[in-house]
Amino acid sequence: MLNDTRVFEANSQGGGAFGDLPEWDLSDLYASEDAAELQADLTWLKQSCIDFSNDYEGKLAQLNADEMLKAVERYEAIDIIAGRIMSFAGLRYYQLTTDPERAKFMSDMQDKLTEHTTKLVFYGLEFNRLDEEALSKLLSQNTALARYKPVFDRMRAMKPYQLSDEMEKFLHDQSVVGATAWNRLFDETIASLVFTIDGEDLPLEAATNKLSEQDRDTREAAAREIARVLRENTSLFARVHNTLAKDKEIEDRWRKMPTPQTGRHLSNHVEAKVVEALRNAVVAAYPKLSHRYYALKAKWLGLETMQIWDRNAPLPIEDDKLVDWTAAQEMVLSAYAEFSPEMAEIAKQFFTKSWIDAAVKPGKAPGAFAHPTVTTVHPYVMLNYLGKPDDVMTLAHELGHGVHQVLAAQQGELLSSTPLTLAETASVFGEMLTFRKLLAAAKTPQERKVLLAGKVESMINTVVRQIAFYDFECKLHAARAEGELTPDQINAIWMSVQGESLGPVFEFMDGYETFWSYIPHFVHSPFYVYAYAFGDGLVNALYAVYEEGDTEFQAKYFDMLRAGGSKHHTELLAPFGLDASDPKFWDKGLSMISAMIDELEAMED
């Protein structure tokens, strides 16, 4: 069932009043929380789940191919209505997480849906008990049913790890007071934090944005204030992480999952060895990527050692003028149009139809995401737009997701959903198109240098930083398996990966050890973060193919996006002559970043 299929931005620093910033119009989902359509859908959903259970529980093995197709289509229809309701409740909540009414509405909807859909738990379990030969026979008898084979393959990949029907129903029922409740506690705590910087009270999003201000004293004040507030709340955040890691360990143990990462790899439809090859390639490249770049940046900033508040500092030669919303829109749409007019046309709808919520507001969820909602409606994009060049890239990134989600919707609800590893492809590609357009338009070497440095920095944040995050999670879950972790122990794990990834030029201020505590991915989606590095590496390799002048590239690229979750990564990449399971594949993507750092170093001579 659709729970939370937001696709997050890896390093968004987001939002403010830069022209007329758009707000969502959620009426394409429902007119309001008491809309008659919503009540009707809840009633329909409840009855449909009962009917589905009555018609199919204990009977799947007896169905012929046509009957099996009917069952799949009925399940898909239920999935759409459940997804529509939760999308509406979730998006309203993200607009104002501090509103108790919105929080209650989301929680009540989650409770109702969980209660109704518990009756469907049997379906996946019973389906997985079908004999392989019998299933193959059914698929060969009905082409419409055979279209769903990728969905069945993913379901059956879970077969070795499924529990008894009764246990599965219990876990499904109990989830609302388990991980979901701790997620909500985290979200509401983060949204309620207040950071006082230069006499101004700010939410987290606006506070972290100060870390990329031109003025060094402002950056330092922001870093120290963030550290102070996080420190005050560390015991609560440590409790959240301890509980969620233990919750995961218990379920993994019962399911006999070999590692804490297995569940994520299965849902990403990617093999552990592919992720391992990616992780090892990135860690081996730390010295020639992040260490080398930050040493160069220290020189530009005139510093012997970098402090943590210098990591995202703009260059001294950087123009700190802000980009208004209209200019940002024009920049991204024209970059998309040069690659493909169709891509720009799809993206344009997000602006004209109120599918974007862009302003920073008190109580609004931090960060940026694209939410696909359901295939019968359309995606929504959330930003916290503050007019920085980074925010323009975030817009390009999230619109890439949006375009991907619109195109993949043609597959229908069950086949449209793209695993995270491939979901980042269109977003990072959208960023790359926007960057290349800006780079081509650079009028002076200085402008080119600023753009290159910005892109390298963004790639380091997407690749190096996210793999360091992945290592942090791996170490955290391994340590938690040995017993409860104190805040100091979690802090120590964080500092070990930060030191390794950022390199010797950094000195870490007292208090930086708590900065793990505000990163939502660790809480919402364990081991999600390697998907960013996967996506970046993949796009760099794809972009190299595009630059080599493949005349059919656009057509192949659109086919890849339209495929949604209907193909495995090996099948999707084959038309481009790429293979992610080859360890050398990742070096190809990393060498693009390295080449940009080479160019920056050459500019010093």
Regions found by a protein language model. Give the residues of each.
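Catalytic Zn2+-binding segment of zinc metalloproteases
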Residues: 400-414, 433
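Short pre-active-site segment immediately N-terminal to the catalytic Zn-binding motif
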Residues: 320-325, 375-396
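Active-site metal-coordination segments of metallo-dependent hydrolases
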Residues: 414-426, 458, 487, 525-532
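C-terminal, non-catalytic "cap/extension" segments appended to globular domains
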Residues: 17-20, 27, 33, 123, ...
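A well-structured
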Residues: 1-318, 603-605
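Long, K/E/R/D-enriched contiguous segments that form extended
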Residues: 295-338, 344, 348, 370, ...
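Catalytic zinc-binding patch centered on the HExxH motif and its immediate surroundings
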Residues: 321-323, 356-378
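A sensor for short, sequence-defined functional sites
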Residues: 123, 127, 131-136, 339-343, ...
